[in-house]
Design a protein with these regions (language model features):
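Active-site-proximal cap/loop segments of hydrolase catalytic domains
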Residues: 434, 488-681
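Blade/loop signatures of beta-propeller domains
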Residues: 22-35, 70, 189-191
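Blade-terminus and WD-like Trp-Asp/Gly-His loop motifs, strongest in beta-propeller folds
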Residues: 50-57, 98-107, 144-152, 225-233, ...
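Cap/lid segment of the alpha/beta-hydrolase catalytic domain
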Residues: 407-533, 540, 574-581
């Protein structure tokens, strides 16, 4: 469903000043010796590694940009775990994803679009031949799972819209609930189906106004469905409504396939998700916030059997976890989360203490999800990066082994001169118990001369439940290649230290994090490497919030870039996809008690009169996560007062551009704006 007119051009410009650009940053025909926009076009993304049942190979999704057609081409590659030998197996199919091995290892099933552009299940015989389309769902299939004996699939698909005739076709009013203001209809529920692995007619397993979850990027994938070990039951997550703001009302359920009866697994009616039965059928792991409050980090809980709340087995680690992967012996889970200046993997026994795995300089991808798999002999495969290397697939041959790079999809980057990055630490400016040791990542320009003072560009991460890590960063390397220092500070609310650090942002959305960022800048100044007259602040999403907040609380900034900026928390509460779920981040609804003043005081737009920094605003028109109304508010707050500003909007849905051309355009405009205000080394 298209929300906006196709007559809109690729992006439109609202400018408060005449031709203020010195010209477009050129896109080289061939990549240079340092990281540039041409290198962005050469990057390959790898994700979703799945180890074969014999443990000898894995299949992974490989995604490359096609600028001529503005597409992300996703194919499946088979990789030998011993040698790294790689071959593509989907024979030119351009939209393959979600690969899953059959239990016997003779087939790989995956999702791809059919002629009607609906995702269907395709099955590929590993002995040879082309994949065949198994399903003919009238709507896109969201996910699937093999039955343990390989005889069938369970899958989740959105219900088909009811057919209307005559005047009823135009009767399209819908009841508004806790949804996004961009909704043009009430979302239909997603339900479970089963189909034979040989094909044929699918059987509906569930129905009703409730729904299985669907993905709302940026965020984790939908909570996976899973068969129990004996294949008699299905485990899934149930949401009580289809309204996006009600996603927190989630609870794990189990469906008996023989009787059709479904029951809740735990007593939790909110925040419980990602249930995974153990291979031996004796346990179930699921994700749930400690103490049942979504202000806290998520932990892994383990239930004996399929009934009960279980017990928290990861609270001692004190990190934020999104997923549990069972080891083959069912005695432990593998999990991961952000940790200090990197991300970590742990093996957590059902009973006993966790062991952190040795990953060296490799940072696993943990953005809302642990992109990993555990093999039949206990191998662990995951996607990750190193500070000077884009994403590849890495393997731990055993829990005690060191991570080794398995793939070389981005091998060309090995010869590139990149900026060195390092971890910077400082003490937060608050008194105990909030005088944390904090960190951030500093990236130098390539061939930096030690001690030389350079302009400083802040790139502040979003979330805020996320963190900047000493890993490969496209933004940091692109900006550093211009001759500037790049600083990616972590701040209270980040999830790289402990639960107390993460929840310290509650009812302190900007002031506390702002003090943390200022303290980090002061630490860099003391090194004598910062040109203090030339400091810029930038960020996307919550990074855009922090950018907007900081330009209203300090005037030393030379330039600012606010991508998808949260400027008005009232708009976030009333208009965004999460809407009412955001109340816990402040303490209560702005329309109850005396909470309104908290929401207003923590909104950057409240301090518009102090904003004096030349600012670039970037946003998608159909941004459901951070409404574009807030971009307009920031734009007018600056423009109407004579502050130099430009606002570029992309006429697409989503929280940020996902297509190659617009992604590159964001990078390009980022550099161009900074180039107007910062000198080069």
């Amino acid at each position: 469903m298209k929300i906006y007119s196709p007559l809109l051009i690729a992006c439109f410009l609202i400018s408060a000043s005449p031709a203020s650009s010195s010209g477009r940053v050129p896109i080289p025909d061939t990549p240079g010796k340092v990281f540039d926009l041409a290198w962005v076009g050469k990057m390959t993304r790898v994700s979703d590694p799945q180890i074969a049942p014999d443990g000898k190979s894995l299949v992974t999704v490989v995604t490359t940009p096609d600028y001529e057609n503005d597409l992300n081409i996703s194919e499946l590659a088979l990789v030998d775990i011993s040698s790294g030998a790689t071959r593509f197996i989907t024979h030119g199919r351009k939209n393959a994803g979600f690969p899953r091995w059959s239990p016997s290892g003779d087939r790989v099933a995956f999702l791809a679009a059919d002629g009607d552009k609906h995702n269907q299940i395709f099955v590929l015989d590993m002995a040879g031949g082309d994949a065949f389309q198994l399903t003919k769902s009238p709507t896109s299939i969201q996910q699937f799972a093999w039955k343990p004996d390989g005889s069938a699939f369970a899958y989740a698909a959105i219900d088909e819209a009811p057919k209307k005739t005559g005047a009823d076709k135009f009767d399209d009013a819908f009841e508004v609930g806790n949804g996004s203001f961009l909704d043009k209809e009430k979302a239909l529920p997603t339900h479970l189906w089963q189909v034979s692995a040989a094909g044929g007619e699918a059987k509906r397993l569930t129905s009703g106004t409730w729904t299985l979850p669907v993905a709302f990027p940026p965020g984790p994938p939908a909570s996976p469905i899973a068969f129990t070990a004996d294949g008699s039951k299905l485990v899934y997550v149930r949401l009580e409504t289809t309204y996006s703001g009600d996603r927190r009302h989630s609870s794990p359920h189990v469906l008996d396939l023989a009787t059709g009866r479904s029951e809740p697994i735990t007593t939790h009616t909110m925040f419980a998700s990602f249930p995974v039965p153990s291979p031996d059928g004796k346990h179930l792991a699921y994700v749930y916030p400690r103490d049942g409050s979504d202000r806290n980090y998520q932990d892994i809980f383990v239930v004996d059997g399929l009934k009960g709340d279980g017990r928290n087995i990861t609270h001692v680690i004190d990190r934020n976890f999104f997923r549990a992967l069972w080891t083959p012996d069912s005695k432990a889970i593998v999990t991961g989360g952000n940790d200090g200046a990197t991300a970590g993997l742990w093996i957590q026994p059902v009973d006993g203490h966790a062991t952190k795995l040795d990953l060296g300089d490799v940072t696993p991808n943990t953005g809302f999800w642990l992109d990993a798999d555990v093999g039949p002999q206990g191998q662990i495969a995951f996607s990750g990066t190193e500070p000077h290397r884009p994403a590849e697939i890495y393997v731990l041959d055993s829990p005690g082994a060191k991570a080794r790079r398995l793939t070389k999809f981005n091998a060309d980057f090995d010869a590139l001169t990149l900026g060195k990055s390092e971890v910077v630490t400082w003490k937060s400016p608050d008194k105990a118990p909030k005088n944390w040791t904090e960190n951030g990542i500093l990236t130098y320009p390539p061939n930096y001369a030690p001690g030389k003072k350079l302009p400083l560009v802040l790139y502040i991460h979003g979330g805020p439940t996320s963190s900047s890590k000493n890993a490969f960063s496209v933004f940091a390397q692109l900006i550093a290649a211009q001759g500037w220092l790049v600083f990616e500070p972590n701040y209270r609310g980040s999830d790289n230290f402990g639960n107390d650090y993460g929840r310290a942002i509650v009812d302190d959305s900007g002031d506390g994090p702002g003090r943390d960022v200022f303290a980090g800048i002061e630490t860099l100044k003391k090194r004598g490497i910062v040109d203090e007259a030339n400091i810029a602040v930038t960020g996307w999403s919550y990074g855009g919030y922090m950018t907007s907040w900081l330009i209203g609380h300090a005037q030393f900034w030379k330039a600012a870039i606010a991508g998808a900026p949260v400027t008005n928390l009232l708009d976030q509460y009333t208009l965004s996809d999460a809407n009412v779920a955001r109340a816990t981040s402040i303490g209560g609804s702005p329309y109850t008690g005396d909470w309104m003043k908290h929401w207003v005081e923590q909104s950057p737009i409240t301090y518009y009169q102090k904003m004096k920094t030349p600012t670039l605003v970037l946003q998608d028109v159909g941004d459901y996560r951070v409404t574009i109304t807030q971009g307009y508010e920031l734009y007018h707050a600056l423009k109407d007062r004579g502050i130099q500003t430009q606002f570029y909007a992309y006429p697409i849905g989503g929280h940020s551009p996902a297509d190659p051309v617009r992604i590159r355009d964001v990078y390009r405009r980022w550099i161009e704006w900074l180039d107007l205000y910062l000198p080069h080394s």
